């Protein structure tokens, strides 16, 4: 069974928002090695983890309301 395009779009949008918010809210000064866009690994992992949790809850909620398939 293929995943619907709407599910993929929700995951991409929510994860992008979480990474942007995590860049400014998570401040880990112990690890100073920065990757792309001046965000370190701890900030990236925390943001992506939260993004996946919020995305999963959003998709399940929208599917239970029959707004997406």
Curated annotation (Swiss-Prot):
Record protein name field: Photosystem I reaction center subunit PsaK
Membrane-crossing ranges are 1-21, 42-62
Protein family (similarity comment): Belongs to the PsaG/PsaK family.
Taxonomic lineage:
Eukaryota, Rhodophyta, Bangiophyceae, Galdieriales, Galdieriaceae
Query: From which organism does this entry originate?
Result: Galdieria sulphuraria
SUPFAM superfamilies registered for this protein in UniProt: Photosystem I reaction center subunit X, PsaK
Main location group:
plastid
Q: Where is this chain's protein located in or outside the cell?
A: Plastid, Chloroplast thylakoid membrane
**Keyword Transmembrane carried by entry:** yes
* The entry's keywords: Chloroplast, Membrane, Photosynthesis, Photosystem I, Plastid, Thylakoid, Transmembrane, Transmembrane helix
Q: Which Gene Ontology cellular-component terms appear in the entry?
A: chloroplast thylakoid membrane; photosystem I
């Amino acid at each position: 069974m293929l995943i619907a395009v709407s599910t993929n779009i929700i995951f991409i949008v929510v994860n992008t928002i979480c990474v942007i918010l995590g860049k400014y809210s998570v401040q880990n000064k112990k690890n100073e090695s920065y990757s792309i866009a001046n965000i370190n690994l701890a900030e990236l992992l925390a943001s992506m983890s939260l993004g996946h949790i919020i995305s999963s809850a959003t998709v399940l909620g929208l599917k239970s309301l029959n707004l997406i398939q």
